[in-house]
Amino acid sequence: MTNFEPKKLKNIWTIEDSISTYNIDKWGDKYFSINSKGNISVTKDIKSENKIDLFKLVKELKSREINPPLIIRFNDILKDRINALHDSFFKAIKTYKYKNIYQGVFPVKCNQQKNVLEKIIEFGSQWNFGLEVGSKSELLIGLALLENQNSLLICNGYKDKKYIEIATLARKLGKNPIIVIEQRDEVKRIIQAVQELNATPLIGIRAKLSSKSSGRWGKSIGDNSKFGLSIPEIMLTIKELKEANLINEMKLLHFHIGSQISDIAVIKDALQEASQIYVELCKLGAPMQYIDVGGGLGIDFDGTKTSSNTSTNYSLQNYANDVIATIKDSCELNNIKHPIIISESGRAIISHCSVLIFNVLGTSHVSSKLQIFDKKNQQLIISNLLETFYELKKLKNKKINLSQIIELWNDAKKFKEDCLVAFRLGFLSLAERAYAEELTWACAKEISKNLNNDAINHPDLSEITETLASTYYANLSIFKSIPDSWAINQIFPIVPIHRHLEEPFCKGNFADLTCDSDGKLNNFIDDGKIKSLLNLHKPEEDKDYLIGIFMTGAYQEALGNLHNLFGSTNVVHIDINQDNSYKVKNIIKEDSKSEILQLLDYSSASLVESIRINTESAIDQKKLTIEEARKLMDQIEISLRKSSYLSE
């Protein structure tokens, strides 16, 4: 096997090294970088030089008692994403001489927070940007927030009689709801509502496409997809709308090919099929005006620009070009007027603006020191393990033969296994077993210190890195703040927000606060590759080590749950000023323990009273003094008002 030079440490760690290690310049989309102080910086928009220091911001928020874990939302980035989406479509419309407009909507399910939706409507108002809703509750939000009478309100999801009645009558308020038929029985309900209410809604149809999708949400398309009408069902629906004299209200064709589509070829295939369906609907006599291409516009979480589940092999402009060009070609071939194009791009709009910040509470790692052990009474199997360790130490600063290293490591593993067998049979003491494990770790450390990355990643040695990895204990709940990481193994960019002038020598992963073995983060973006460990710094005593999880704006807050009763974190909305300062626009305080318990039907007052009765009983039995009881009750009442997360 190949001989390797001994591992050499880098003399100076630079900002460029950190940018490369964490791939920030690739996934950051120019919104995130590292400043001269070694801290993460946040840019106002991709064309701006206005930046703020994220680490400084978090420290100053702490001085206001807004502590991690917290979500920081940058309004300027949200605005820039909306601008970028519209700019891309406007450029495509101009390039391809498309004879109509783009008019987008934001899917409320991506982030239902009131402050978020208000900002989206504000930033998109110049383009009549609307909302897409998928339930009666979301419909009520849309009707309340959308005041622009030119904005669209796309009504998707399952629809009962009340849903259809509300959407139908809302048209008389000057709103623009379009009821999208996704199930056959909705046709009958719409006809019934028209007859009973003396009002007519705008109508759309969602088509089930036969085009094949890809990625995690590939089953959103095809004959067995959850929503939409098959082609025979569409034909029957058109017939029934004509018979009910409602065909003139049929305005929109909608399709959806899934979320986070990574391959542009999938989008092109779906567009070609849907465009032809649109053309045929026009030929059947429906006065069509809109084609809603749904969601699916992906973002590049890992920065690789590939067709992997966590990336995309296309840009925002590529996407807009293909949408415009494909629809135009189909319409012009059939002498059909170009429709208004709608998209429901949620993730691409909302993801970048949110950063989840948490602090590290502590770490655990393999022992760095060997115990002093009595060699006279040492068992042979332990002596063999110790001899292997000494053989590895002799290789320090020498040219290393990889086959020799692999042989010694295999010996160490075998001797350790022999020790475990001996312990189970009662031939080794607990202290001897501990010494054997420490010797094995010491062997792994000697190999790690001497081999470069290429060698240590050899299949026969790769487990060494895992063996030596540290666990960093994170002050957050994965199930509450980033549930997609647990549920679907979604990978988010995770980066320390400071100390980037120092080399991150440690390899580690994160464990959250919950009592659940799934509460771990162990998939990371490392130099453009997905790895199980992240380069991290050793936390400094009495100093915060702050980590950022980026691109978390879509779905996470809506999907988060109360596992172990960890509640919502602090949320702060920030505006970046022209002078590189910032303004705190909104603060949404975290859930207190009392508020969380109330959600589950517990009365804080009743709980306190129940515990107080127990303390009185303990006082009577001389188990507790009055002073101890008072202190306990004070702590409980204070705790109920405080965060569910750990504090200093």
Swiss-Prot record:
It holds the Pfam family Arg_decarb_HB. Its cofactor is Mg(2+); pyridoxal 5'-phosphate. Substrate binds at residues 291-301. The keyword Kinase does not apply. It comes from the Bacteria. Catalyzes the biosynthesis of agmatine from arginine. PANTHER family: ARGININE DECARBOXYLASE, BIOSYNTHETIC ARGININE DECARBOXYLASE. This is Biosynthetic arginine decarboxylase. The gene is speA.
